[in-house]
Protein backbone atom coordinates (compact mmCIF):
# COMPACT_ATOMS: atom_id res chain seq x y z
CA UNK A 1 0.00 0.00 0.00
CA UNK A 2 2.87 2.34 0.83
CA UNK A 3 4.41 1.50 -2.56
CA UNK A 4 1.26 2.65 -4.35
CA UNK A 5 0.49 5.75 -2.29
CA UNK A 6 4.02 6.69 -1.36
CA UNK A 7 5.54 7.45 2.01
CA UNK A 8 2.96 9.14 4.29
CA UNK A 9 5.70 11.41 5.64
CA UNK A 10 6.52 12.72 2.16
CA UNK A 11 3.46 15.01 2.00
CA UNK A 12 3.58 18.53 3.49
CA UNK A 13 1.35 17.60 6.41
CA UNK A 14 3.23 14.32 6.81
CA UNK A 15 6.56 16.10 7.06
CA UNK A 16 5.25 18.45 9.74
CA UNK A 17 3.68 15.57 11.64
CA UNK A 18 6.91 13.56 11.53
CA UNK A 19 8.79 16.48 13.05
CA UNK A 20 6.08 17.19 15.67
CA UNK A 21 6.13 13.57 16.88
CA UNK A 22 9.89 13.07 17.01
CA UNK A 23 10.88 11.26 20.18
CA UNK A 24 13.85 13.57 20.70
CA UNK A 25 11.56 16.52 21.48
CA UNK A 26 11.47 17.52 25.12
CA UNK A 27 7.92 18.88 24.83
CA UNK A 28 5.18 19.42 22.27
CA UNK A 29 6.05 21.74 19.41
CA UNK A 30 2.89 23.82 19.26
CA UNK A 31 4.11 25.71 16.21
CA UNK A 32 4.21 22.51 14.20
CA UNK A 33 0.95 21.32 15.73
CA UNK A 34 -0.93 24.45 14.65
CA UNK A 35 0.72 24.36 11.24
CA UNK A 36 -0.60 20.82 10.80
CA UNK A 37 -4.11 22.07 11.64
CA UNK A 38 -3.81 24.87 9.09
CA UNK A 39 -2.70 22.50 6.34
CA UNK A 40 -5.59 20.14 7.09
CA UNK A 41 -8.11 22.97 6.91
CA UNK A 42 -6.70 24.66 3.80
CA UNK A 43 -5.82 21.77 1.48
CA UNK A 44 -8.07 19.23 -0.20
CA UNK A 45 -5.96 16.20 0.64
CA UNK A 46 -4.85 17.49 4.01
CA UNK A 47 -7.23 15.37 6.16
CA UNK A 48 -6.43 12.13 4.35
CA UNK A 49 -2.67 12.76 4.37
CA UNK A 50 -2.76 13.57 8.08
CA UNK A 51 -4.66 10.36 8.90
CA UNK A 52 -2.18 8.29 6.89
CA UNK A 53 0.76 9.88 8.70
CA UNK A 54 -0.87 9.36 12.10
CA UNK A 55 -1.53 5.70 11.35
CA UNK A 56 2.09 5.32 10.32
CA UNK A 57 3.29 6.83 13.59
CA UNK A 58 0.87 4.97 15.89
CA UNK A 59 0.64 1.45 14.47
CA UNK A 60 3.16 -0.93 15.98
CA UNK A 61 5.28 1.82 17.51
CA UNK A 62 6.99 0.76 20.74
CA UNK A 63 8.40 4.21 21.37
CA UNK A 64 5.61 5.43 23.63
CA UNK A 65 7.12 8.90 23.78
CA UNK A 66 6.37 9.26 20.07
CA UNK A 67 2.95 7.67 20.62
CA UNK A 68 2.07 10.26 23.27
CA UNK A 69 3.19 13.13 21.02
CA UNK A 70 1.15 11.69 18.13
CA UNK A 71 -1.94 11.42 20.35
CA UNK A 72 -1.46 15.05 21.38
CA UNK A 73 -1.28 16.10 17.72
CA UNK A 74 -4.40 14.04 16.97
CA UNK A 75 -6.35 15.65 19.82
CA UNK A 76 -5.27 19.14 18.76
CA UNK A 77 -6.34 18.52 15.16
CA UNK A 78 -9.76 17.21 16.24
CA UNK A 79 -10.34 20.36 18.29
CA UNK A 80 -9.14 22.78 15.61
CA UNK A 81 -10.13 21.13 12.32
CA UNK A 82 -13.46 20.81 10.58
CA UNK A 83 -15.98 18.15 9.67
CA UNK A 84 -13.84 16.64 6.91
CA UNK A 85 -11.23 15.57 9.43
CA UNK A 86 -13.83 14.49 12.01
CA UNK A 87 -15.36 11.98 9.60
CA UNK A 88 -12.00 10.26 9.15
CA UNK A 89 -11.18 10.24 12.87
CA UNK A 90 -14.60 9.14 14.16
CA UNK A 91 -14.64 6.31 11.65
CA UNK A 92 -15.04 2.90 13.25
CA UNK A 93 -12.13 1.53 11.23
CA UNK A 94 -9.69 4.18 12.49
CA UNK A 95 -10.77 3.89 16.14
CA UNK A 96 -10.72 0.10 16.15
CA UNK A 97 -7.62 -0.55 14.06
CA UNK A 98 -5.45 2.25 15.49
CA UNK A 99 -6.48 3.48 18.94
CA UNK A 100 -7.98 0.29 20.37
CA UNK A 101 -5.07 -1.68 18.98
CA UNK A 102 -2.62 0.53 20.90
CA UNK A 103 -4.13 -0.42 24.27
CA UNK A 104 -4.57 -4.12 23.48
CA UNK A 105 -3.13 -6.44 26.17
CA UNK A 106 -0.58 -7.96 23.82
CA UNK A 107 1.09 -4.56 23.35
CA UNK A 108 1.07 -3.93 27.12
CA UNK A 109 1.31 -0.12 26.89
CA UNK A 110 2.02 2.07 29.93
CA UNK A 111 -0.89 3.25 32.03
CA UNK A 112 -0.45 6.83 30.86
CA UNK A 113 -0.93 5.75 27.23
CA UNK A 114 -3.99 3.67 28.08
CA UNK A 115 -5.59 6.55 29.97
CA UNK A 116 -4.86 8.95 27.13
CA UNK A 117 -6.45 6.71 24.48
CA UNK A 118 -9.51 5.96 26.61
CA UNK A 119 -9.95 9.65 27.46
CA UNK A 120 -9.91 10.55 23.75
CA UNK A 121 -12.47 7.86 22.87
CA UNK A 122 -14.74 8.97 25.70
CA UNK A 123 -14.52 12.67 24.83
CA UNK A 124 -15.21 12.06 21.14
CA UNK A 125 -18.13 9.74 21.90
CA UNK A 126 -19.75 12.46 24.02
CA UNK A 127 -19.06 15.18 21.45
CA UNK A 128 -20.15 13.27 18.32
CA UNK A 129 -23.12 11.41 19.79
CA UNK A 130 -25.64 13.72 18.14
CA UNK A 131 -24.05 13.53 14.67
CA UNK A 132 -25.38 10.58 12.63
CA UNK A 133 -22.27 10.30 10.43
CA UNK A 134 -19.85 10.40 13.39
CA UNK A 135 -21.27 7.58 15.51
CA UNK A 136 -18.52 5.06 14.80
CA UNK A 137 -16.60 6.15 17.87
CA UNK A 138 -19.83 6.00 19.89
CA UNK A 139 -20.31 2.33 18.99
CA UNK A 140 -16.73 1.51 19.94
CA UNK A 141 -17.17 3.36 23.24
CA UNK A 142 -20.32 1.40 24.10
CA UNK A 143 -18.68 -1.90 23.19
CA UNK A 144 -15.71 -1.19 25.42
CA UNK A 145 -17.99 -0.33 28.32
CA UNK A 146 -19.93 -3.57 27.86
CA UNK A 147 -16.65 -5.47 27.97
CA UNK A 148 -15.88 -3.92 31.35
CA UNK A 149 -13.26 -1.37 30.31
CA UNK A 150 -13.00 1.39 32.93
CA UNK A 151 -12.68 4.86 31.45
CA UNK A 152 -10.86 7.65 33.33
CA UNK A 153 -12.66 10.56 34.92
CA UNK A 154 -13.65 13.26 32.44
CA UNK A 155 -12.08 16.69 32.79
CA UNK A 156 -13.78 20.07 32.49
CA UNK A 157 -13.44 20.20 28.72
CA UNK A 158 -15.86 17.30 28.46
CA UNK A 159 -18.68 19.59 29.58
CA UNK A 160 -18.61 21.45 26.25
CA UNK A 161 -18.68 19.92 22.77
CA UNK A 162 -15.62 19.93 20.57
CA UNK A 163 -15.75 22.84 18.14
CA UNK A 164 -13.47 24.38 15.57
CA UNK A 165 -12.54 28.01 16.27
CA UNK A 166 -11.88 30.44 13.47
CA UNK A 167 -8.32 31.21 12.55
CA UNK A 168 -7.33 34.12 14.77
CA UNK A 169 -4.00 35.26 13.27
CA UNK A 170 -3.09 35.28 9.57
CA UNK A 171 0.01 33.48 8.52
CA UNK A 172 3.12 35.70 8.86
CA UNK A 173 6.83 35.38 8.46
CA UNK A 174 8.26 32.56 10.57
CA UNK A 175 10.61 35.08 12.19
CA UNK A 176 7.66 36.74 13.94
CA UNK A 177 7.10 33.92 16.38
CA UNK A 178 5.68 35.82 19.34
CA UNK A 179 2.19 36.64 17.98
CA UNK A 180 1.94 33.19 16.45
CA UNK A 181 2.81 31.50 19.72
CA UNK A 182 0.06 33.44 21.49
CA UNK A 183 -2.54 32.35 18.92
CA UNK A 184 -1.37 28.77 19.27
CA UNK A 185 -1.84 28.90 23.02
CA UNK A 186 -5.40 30.22 22.62
CA UNK A 187 -6.48 27.51 20.17
CA UNK A 188 -4.72 24.53 21.69
CA UNK A 189 -6.41 22.19 24.15
CA UNK A 190 -7.01 23.59 27.61
CA UNK A 191 -5.11 20.78 29.30
CA UNK A 192 -1.99 21.65 27.30
CA UNK A 193 -2.08 25.43 27.70
CA UNK A 194 1.12 27.07 28.94
CA UNK A 195 1.80 30.57 30.26
CA UNK A 196 3.28 33.07 27.76
CA UNK A 197 5.85 34.09 26.67
CA UNK A 198 7.97 31.06 27.47
CA UNK A 199 8.59 29.61 24.02
CA UNK A 200 6.34 26.57 23.62
CA UNK A 201 6.66 25.50 27.24
CA UNK A 202 4.00 22.82 27.48
CA UNK A 203 3.56 20.06 30.06
CA UNK A 204 5.83 17.09 29.76
CA UNK A 205 4.51 13.69 28.78
CA UNK A 206 3.92 12.43 32.34
CA UNK A 207 1.70 15.44 32.97
CA UNK A 208 -0.71 14.26 30.27
CA UNK A 209 -2.37 11.78 32.65
CA UNK A 210 -6.02 12.59 33.37
CA UNK A 211 -6.17 10.83 36.73
CA UNK A 212 -4.82 13.70 38.87
CA UNK A 213 -6.65 16.73 40.27
CA UNK A 214 -7.82 19.48 37.93
CA UNK A 215 -6.55 23.02 38.33
CA UNK A 216 -9.01 25.08 36.32
CA UNK A 217 -8.16 28.49 34.94
CA UNK A 218 -10.52 31.46 34.93
CA UNK A 219 -11.95 30.64 31.50
CA UNK A 220 -12.77 27.08 32.48
CA UNK A 221 -14.30 28.21 35.76
CA UNK A 222 -16.52 30.69 33.91
CA UNK A 223 -17.63 27.98 31.48
CA UNK A 224 -18.30 25.60 34.37
CA UNK A 225 -20.42 28.17 36.18
CA UNK A 226 -22.47 28.77 33.06
CA UNK A 227 -23.07 25.02 32.87
CA UNK A 228 -24.08 24.98 36.53
CA UNK A 229 -26.59 27.75 35.84
CA UNK A 230 -28.21 25.47 33.26
CA UNK A 231 -28.37 22.68 35.83
CA UNK A 232 -29.94 25.03 38.39
CA UNK A 233 -32.53 26.12 35.83
CA UNK A 234 -33.49 22.53 35.06
CA UNK A 235 -33.70 21.76 38.77
CA UNK A 236 -35.97 24.76 39.39
CA UNK A 237 -38.31 23.84 36.54
CA UNK A 238 -38.49 20.25 37.74
CA UNK A 239 -39.22 21.35 41.31
CA UNK A 240 -42.02 23.70 40.19
CA UNK A 241 -43.59 20.96 38.08
CA UNK A 242 -43.54 18.56 41.02
CA UNK A 243 -45.24 21.24 43.15
CA UNK A 244 -48.03 21.88 40.64
CA UNK A 245 -48.72 18.35 39.40
CA UNK A 246 -51.08 16.03 41.29
CA UNK A 247 -50.26 12.29 41.19
CA UNK A 248 -52.79 10.45 39.10
CA UNK A 249 -54.23 13.64 37.56
CA UNK A 250 -51.25 14.85 35.56
CA UNK A 251 -51.34 15.67 31.86
CA UNK A 252 -49.51 13.28 29.54
CA UNK A 253 -47.36 16.03 28.00
CA UNK A 254 -46.40 17.39 31.43
CA UNK A 255 -45.52 13.90 32.62
CA UNK A 256 -43.35 13.30 29.56
CA UNK A 257 -41.54 16.61 30.10
CA UNK A 258 -41.00 15.78 33.78
CA UNK A 259 -39.51 12.39 32.92
CA UNK A 260 -37.20 13.98 30.34
CA UNK A 261 -36.03 16.54 32.92
CA UNK A 262 -35.35 13.71 35.35
CA UNK A 263 -33.15 11.89 32.83
CA UNK A 264 -31.28 15.07 31.91
CA UNK A 265 -30.64 16.08 35.51
CA UNK A 266 -29.40 12.62 36.41
CA UNK A 267 -26.91 12.72 33.54
CA UNK A 268 -25.73 16.13 34.73
CA UNK A 269 -25.38 14.86 38.28
CA UNK A 270 -22.98 12.15 37.13
CA UNK A 271 -20.66 14.79 35.69
CA UNK A 272 -20.96 16.92 38.81
CA UNK A 273 -20.05 14.01 41.09
CA UNK A 274 -17.02 13.30 38.93
CA UNK A 275 -15.87 16.91 39.13
CA UNK A 276 -16.33 17.22 42.90
CA UNK A 277 -13.46 14.84 43.58
CA UNK A 278 -11.25 16.32 40.87
CA UNK A 279 -11.51 20.10 41.09
CA UNK A 280 -8.95 21.69 43.41
CA UNK A 281 -10.69 25.09 43.60
CA UNK A 282 -12.59 25.30 46.90
CA UNK A 283 -15.16 27.82 45.66
CA UNK A 284 -15.99 25.70 42.63
CA UNK A 285 -16.19 22.59 44.80
CA UNK A 286 -18.62 24.35 47.13
CA UNK A 287 -20.85 25.35 44.21
CA UNK A 288 -20.77 21.80 42.89
CA UNK A 289 -21.80 20.45 46.29
CA UNK A 290 -24.73 22.88 46.54
CA UNK A 291 -25.97 21.95 43.08
CA UNK A 292 -25.59 18.26 43.89
CA UNK A 293 -27.67 18.70 47.06
CA UNK A 294 -30.41 20.46 45.09
CA UNK A 295 -30.43 17.63 42.57
CA UNK A 296 -30.69 15.00 45.31
CA UNK A 297 -33.64 16.83 46.89
CA UNK A 298 -35.55 17.11 43.64
CA UNK A 299 -34.81 13.46 42.84
CA UNK A 300 -36.33 12.44 46.18
CA UNK A 301 -39.46 14.45 45.40
CA UNK A 302 -39.66 12.89 41.94
CA UNK A 303 -39.35 9.36 43.33
CA UNK A 304 -42.09 10.12 45.87
CA UNK A 305 -44.27 11.49 43.07
CA UNK A 306 -43.75 8.34 41.00
CA UNK A 307 -44.63 6.12 43.96
CA UNK A 308 -47.86 8.02 44.60
CA UNK A 309 -48.73 8.01 40.91
CA UNK A 310 -48.17 4.28 40.50
CA UNK A 311 -50.00 3.55 43.77
CA UNK A 312 -52.96 5.70 42.72
CA UNK A 313 -53.26 3.93 39.37
CA UNK A 314 -53.13 0.50 41.02
CA UNK A 315 -55.69 1.61 43.63
CA UNK A 316 -58.09 2.89 40.98
CA UNK A 317 -57.82 -0.32 39.03
CA UNK A 318 -58.42 -2.47 42.12
CA UNK A 319 -61.34 -0.28 43.23
CA UNK A 320 -63.00 -0.71 39.86
CA UNK A 321 -62.72 -4.48 40.07
CA UNK A 322 -63.94 -4.60 43.68
CA UNK A 323 -66.92 -2.37 42.95
CA UNK A 324 -68.00 -4.58 40.09
CA UNK A 325 -67.63 -7.77 42.11
CA UNK A 326 -69.36 -6.29 45.17
CA UNK A 327 -72.31 -5.10 43.15
CA UNK A 328 -72.84 -8.50 41.59
CA UNK A 329 -71.81 -11.18 44.06
CA UNK A 330 -70.61 -10.08 47.50
CA UNK A 331 -72.70 -10.10 50.68
CA UNK A 332 -71.47 -8.01 53.59
CA UNK A 333 -72.55 -9.66 56.85
CA UNK A 334 -71.94 -6.56 58.97
CA UNK A 335 -74.80 -4.48 60.44
CA UNK A 336 -76.14 -1.72 58.25
CA UNK A 337 -74.52 -3.18 55.19
CA UNK A 338 -75.37 -1.60 51.86
CA UNK A 339 -75.60 -5.12 50.47
CA UNK A 340 -78.87 -5.61 52.36
CA UNK A 341 -80.57 -2.89 50.39
CA UNK A 342 -78.89 -3.35 47.05
CA UNK A 343 -79.94 -1.11 44.17
CA UNK A 344 -80.14 -4.20 41.99
CA UNK A 345 -83.06 -5.58 44.07
CA UNK A 346 -85.33 -2.75 43.07
CA UNK A 347 -84.78 -3.51 39.43
CA UNK A 348 -85.88 -7.16 39.73
CA UNK A 349 -89.15 -8.75 40.76
CA UNK A 350 -89.74 -9.12 44.52
CA UNK A 351 -87.98 -12.31 45.60
CA UNK A 352 -90.25 -15.09 46.68
CA UNK A 353 -90.06 -16.22 50.27
CA UNK A 354 -89.02 -19.68 51.34
CA UNK A 355 -92.57 -20.68 52.08
CA UNK A 356 -93.78 -19.56 48.66
CA UNK A 357 -91.03 -21.57 47.03
CA UNK A 358 -91.98 -24.62 49.10
CA UNK A 359 -95.57 -24.05 48.11
CA UNK A 360 -94.59 -24.71 44.55
CA UNK A 361 -93.49 -28.23 45.41
CA UNK A 362 -96.09 -30.82 44.55
CA UNK A 363 -96.10 -33.31 47.42
CA UNK A 364 -98.69 -35.37 45.67
CA UNK A 365 -96.27 -36.58 43.07
CA UNK A 366 -94.67 -39.81 44.03
CA UNK A 367 -91.71 -39.62 41.64
CA UNK A 368 -88.42 -37.91 42.34
CA UNK A 369 -88.38 -36.35 38.87
CA UNK A 370 -91.54 -34.45 39.60
CA UNK A 371 -90.03 -32.97 42.74
CA UNK A 372 -86.82 -32.02 40.88
CA UNK A 373 -88.82 -30.34 38.13
CA UNK A 374 -90.60 -28.28 40.75
CA UNK A 375 -87.29 -27.26 42.28
CA UNK A 376 -85.85 -26.27 38.91
CA UNK A 377 -88.65 -23.77 38.40
CA UNK A 378 -87.25 -21.69 41.24
CA UNK A 379 -84.76 -19.05 40.16
CA UNK A 380 -81.52 -19.40 42.16
CA UNK A 381 -80.91 -15.71 41.74
CA UNK A 382 -84.18 -14.91 43.53
CA UNK A 383 -83.28 -17.22 46.37
CA UNK A 384 -79.88 -15.59 46.66
CA UNK A 385 -81.33 -12.08 46.78
CA UNK A 386 -83.96 -13.23 49.27
CA UNK A 387 -81.23 -14.53 51.56
CA UNK A 388 -79.34 -11.25 51.26
CA UNK A 389 -82.46 -9.29 52.22
CA UNK A 390 -83.78 -11.48 55.02
CA UNK A 391 -80.60 -12.64 56.73
CA UNK A 392 -81.56 -10.67 59.88
CA UNK A 393 -85.07 -12.17 60.18
CA UNK A 394 -86.11 -15.59 61.35
CA UNK A 395 -88.20 -17.97 59.30
CA UNK A 396 -91.08 -17.54 61.71
CA UNK A 397 -91.10 -13.76 61.15
CA UNK A 398 -91.08 -14.30 57.41
CA UNK A 399 -94.14 -16.55 57.56
CA UNK A 400 -96.17 -13.78 59.20
CA UNK A 401 -96.21 -11.74 56.04
CA UNK A 402 -96.75 -14.58 53.56
CA UNK A 403 -100.05 -14.44 51.69
CA UNK A 404 -101.47 -16.88 49.20
CA UNK A 405 -103.51 -15.56 46.38
CA UNK A 406 -103.45 -18.88 44.56
CA UNK A 407 -105.91 -21.34 46.12
CA UNK A 408 -103.85 -24.22 44.84
CA UNK A 409 -100.90 -23.15 46.96
CA UNK A 410 -102.83 -23.86 50.15
CA UNK A 411 -102.53 -27.59 49.77
CA UNK A 412 -98.75 -27.56 49.72
CA UNK A 413 -96.20 -28.12 52.41
CA UNK A 414 -95.79 -24.37 52.90
CA UNK A 415 -99.49 -24.01 53.75
CA UNK A 416 -99.11 -26.64 56.42
CA UNK A 417 -96.22 -24.67 57.90
CA UNK A 418 -98.17 -21.42 57.83
CA UNK A 419 -101.44 -22.92 59.15
CA UNK A 420 -99.63 -24.60 61.98
CA UNK A 421 -97.87 -21.41 62.92
CA UNK A 422 -101.06 -19.35 62.64
CA UNK A 423 -103.02 -21.90 64.67
CA UNK A 424 -100.41 -21.96 67.39
CA UNK A 425 -100.47 -18.19 67.52
CA UNK A 426 -104.30 -17.98 67.42
CA UNK A 427 -105.06 -20.46 70.21
CA UNK A 428 -103.94 -18.22 73.11
CA UNK A 429 -106.35 -15.52 71.94
CA UNK A 430 -109.49 -17.66 72.29
CA UNK A 431 -108.22 -19.95 75.04
CA UNK A 432 -109.66 -18.09 78.07
CA UNK A 433 -113.28 -18.34 76.82
CA UNK A 434 -112.96 -22.03 75.96
CA UNK A 435 -111.47 -22.87 79.34
CA UNK A 436 -114.28 -20.99 81.07
CA UNK A 437 -116.86 -23.06 79.19
CA UNK A 438 -115.11 -26.29 80.12
CA UNK A 439 -114.92 -25.31 83.77
CA UNK A 440 -118.65 -24.39 83.81
CA UNK A 441 -119.45 -27.69 82.15
CA UNK A 442 -117.38 -29.62 84.63
CA UNK A 443 -118.99 -27.85 87.55
CA UNK A 444 -122.51 -28.53 86.28
CA UNK A 445 -121.65 -32.09 85.40
CA UNK A 446 -120.01 -32.93 88.66
CA UNK A 447 -122.46 -31.24 91.05
CA UNK A 448 -124.27 -34.39 91.86
CA UNK A 449 -121.19 -36.57 92.00
CA UNK A 450 -119.51 -34.91 94.94
CA UNK A 451 -121.49 -36.99 97.46
CA UNK A 452 -120.96 -40.30 95.73
CA UNK A 453 -118.51 -42.62 97.31
CA UNK A 454 -117.69 -44.81 94.33
CA UNK A 455 -118.29 -45.24 90.64
CA UNK A 456 -119.14 -48.48 88.90
CA UNK A 457 -117.86 -49.45 85.45
CA UNK A 458 -121.23 -48.87 83.87
CA UNK A 459 -121.45 -45.41 85.34
CA UNK A 460 -117.89 -44.68 84.20
CA UNK A 461 -118.73 -45.71 80.61
CA UNK A 462 -121.81 -43.54 80.73
CA UNK A 463 -119.68 -40.68 82.01
CA UNK A 464 -117.29 -41.04 79.08
CA UNK A 465 -120.14 -40.99 76.58
CA UNK A 466 -121.49 -37.80 78.10
CA UNK A 467 -118.06 -36.23 77.98
CA UNK A 468 -117.71 -37.14 74.31
CA UNK A 469 -121.10 -35.62 73.52
CA UNK A 470 -120.16 -32.49 75.41
CA UNK A 471 -116.89 -32.23 73.49
CA UNK A 472 -118.77 -32.37 70.19
CA UNK A 473 -120.94 -29.49 71.34
CA UNK A 474 -117.90 -27.22 71.88
CA UNK A 475 -117.86 -24.50 69.13
CA UNK A 476 -114.93 -24.27 66.64
CA UNK A 477 -112.05 -21.95 67.56
CA UNK A 478 -112.11 -18.62 65.75
CA UNK A 479 -109.28 -18.22 63.23
CA UNK A 480 -106.90 -15.23 63.60
CA UNK A 481 -107.22 -12.31 61.17
CA UNK A 482 -105.10 -12.58 58.00
CA UNK A 483 -103.68 -9.91 55.71
CA UNK A 484 -105.24 -11.40 52.62
CA UNK A 485 -108.71 -12.99 52.41
CA UNK A 486 -108.62 -16.74 52.86
CA UNK A 487 -110.14 -18.96 50.19
CA UNK A 488 -113.93 -19.01 50.16
CA UNK A 489 -114.24 -22.68 50.84
CA UNK A 490 -111.84 -25.47 51.52
CA UNK A 491 -112.71 -29.02 50.58
CA UNK A 492 -113.51 -31.09 53.59
CA UNK A 493 -111.34 -33.81 52.23
CA UNK A 494 -108.21 -31.76 52.94
CA UNK A 495 -108.68 -31.67 56.71
CA UNK A 496 -107.12 -35.05 57.21
CA UNK A 497 -103.96 -34.27 55.21
CA UNK A 498 -103.59 -31.04 57.17
CA UNK A 499 -103.90 -32.85 60.47
CA UNK A 500 -101.44 -35.47 59.35
CA UNK A 501 -99.01 -32.73 58.35
CA UNK A 502 -99.52 -31.11 61.76
CA UNK A 503 -98.74 -34.39 63.41
CA UNK A 504 -95.70 -34.74 61.19
CA UNK A 505 -94.30 -31.37 62.26
CA UNK A 506 -95.21 -32.04 65.86
CA UNK A 507 -92.91 -35.01 65.76
Curated annotation (Swiss-Prot):
The keyword Phosphoprotein applies. The keyword rRNA processing does not apply. The modification Phosphothreonine is found at residue 164. Keywords: Phosphoprotein, Protein transport, Transport. Acts as a MYO6/Myosin VI adapter protein that targets myosin VI to endocytic structures. May also play a role in recruiting clathrin to endosomes. May regulate growth factor-induced mitogenic signaling. Residues 20-152 form the VHS domain. Ubiquitously expressed with higher expression in heart and skeletal muscle. It comes from the Eukaryota. It comes from Homo sapiens. Belongs to the TOM1 family. This is TOM1-like protein 2. A motif (Clathrin-binding) lies at residues 329-334. PANTHER family: TOM1-LIKE PROTEIN 2, VHS DOMAIN CONTAINING PROTEIN FAMILY. GO terms for molecular function: clathrin binding; phosphatidylinositol binding; protein kinase binding; ubiquitin binding.
